[in-house]
């Protein structure tokens, strides 16, 4: 979450006039993340998050994102509930940009997940996948495997400036993953950004997930791979097999994996690391000056890519533990 678009008191009052949420009591920007402008809003009717959607989020995708969040909330999964105005509309406009007001989800994210947190996160991810079954809308993953080659073509000079020789290494990753990307694995709605800052806990127990603005239809095990990269690497860059085993075991306690899904996790994790390296590389150079946001370091994911290149069995060892 971040702030790129400022909103005046008058603009907020005009927006809230369409809702039955009561008068505003407090309103402040949230300076985290890199994607949209987010504000913590407290009114007489409760606590909410106001999100103003910036350039990366396409307006035509917003009905999918908001519809999914409402679907999950109505099917027993804890996520923010988009608020509808008096006319039944969830999607509004402020400063010429689309926006939405979503209920505040209680709980805390963790900066340094423990093995127990990883197990709970795995359970939560499987619960999300199950709750999303039957959601009638569809959205392709525009940051999936097919997008990486053209994305890298645009960013290869930035990669070389970041670290001399890196462009050639990443080019090999792109080609290798295109050759080895798995086919025929179970698909469904995935979160696609299941990082610790998007997952909430209460007293160590999974309490819900937020930030569904990369959600799409893709290989479900790819969501696990994203999570393995996000949750199971230590600060020194090493892969924590115990944490990975806990995450996969937690997932399988709710939704068992097939042998094919488990076997594919190393290549899926390699691909997930490439996806986040590329988008971080883009953000590193594209984040506007003066925004209340610090872009995330792409070299963190360059180091994770190196682990997947040289030691793919580490992920497989982690995946095998749920048996």
From Swiss-Prot:
Pathway, per Swiss-Prot/TrEMBL? Amino-acid biosynthesis; L-threonine biosynthesis; L-threonine from L-aspartate: step 4/5
Keyword annotations from UniProtKB, A to Z: Amino-acid biosynthesis, ATP-binding, Kinase, Nucleotide-binding, Threonine biosynthesis, Transferase
Question: What EC class is this?
Answer: transferase
What InterPro entries does the database record attribute to this sequence? Aminoglycoside_PTrfase, Homoserine_kinase_II, Kinase-like_dom_sf, Pseudomonas-type_ThrB
The record's EC number reads 2.7.1.39
Asked whether the UniProt record includes ATP-binding among its keywords, one would answer yes
The record's annotation in Gene3D superfamilies points to: 3.90.1200.10, Phosphorylase Kinase, domain 1 (3.30.200.20)
Q: Name one GO molecular function term.
A: ATP binding
Q: Which Pfam families match?
A: APH
| UniProt family annotation | Belongs to the pseudomonas-type ThrB family.
Q: Which NCBIfam families match?
A: PRK05231.1 (NF003558), thrB_alt (TIGR00938)
What is this protein's name?
Homoserine kinase
Q: Give the originating organism.
A: Phenylobacterium zucineum (strain HLK1)
């Amino acid at each position: 979450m971040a702030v790129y678009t400022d909103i005046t008191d008058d603009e907020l009052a005009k927006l809230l006039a369409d809702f039955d949420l009561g008068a505003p009591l407090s309103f402040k920007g949230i300076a985290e993340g890199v994607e949209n402008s987010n504000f913590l809003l407290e009114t007489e009717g409760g606590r909410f998050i106001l999100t103003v959607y910036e350039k990366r989020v396409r307006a035509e995708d917003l009905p999918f994102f908001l519809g999914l969040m409402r679907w999950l909330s109505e099917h027993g999964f804890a996520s923010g509930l988009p608020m509808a105005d008096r006319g039944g509309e969830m999607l509004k406009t402020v400063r010429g940009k689309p926006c939405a007001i979503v209920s505040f989800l209680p709980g805390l994210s963790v900066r340094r997940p423990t093995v127990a947190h990883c197990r709970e996160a795995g359970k939560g991810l499987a619960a999300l996948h199950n709750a999303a079954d039957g959601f009638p809308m569809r959205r392709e993953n525009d940051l999936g495997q097919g997008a990486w080659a053209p994305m890298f073509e645009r960013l290869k000079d930035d990669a070389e400036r970041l670290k001399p020789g890196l462009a050639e290494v990443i080019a090999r990753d792109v080609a290798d993953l295109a050759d080895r990307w798995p086919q025929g694995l179970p698909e469904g709605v995935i979160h696609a950004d299941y990082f610790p800052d998007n997952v909430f806990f209460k007293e160590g127990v999974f309490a819900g997930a937020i930030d569904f603005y990369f959600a799409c239809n893709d290989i479900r095990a790819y969501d696990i791979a994203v999570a393995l990269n996000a949750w199971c690497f230590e600060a020194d860059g090493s892969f924590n097999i115990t944490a990975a085993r806990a995450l996969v075991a937690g997932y399988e306690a709710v939704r068992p994996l097939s042998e094919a899904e488990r076997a594919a996790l190393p290549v899926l994790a390699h691909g997930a690391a490439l996806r986040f390296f590329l988008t971080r590389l883009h953000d590193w150079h594209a984040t506007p000056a003066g925004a209340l946001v610090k872009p995330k370091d792409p070299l963190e994911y360059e180091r994770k890519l190196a682990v997947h290149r040289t030691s793919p069995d580490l992920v497989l060892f982690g995946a095998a533990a749920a048996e």
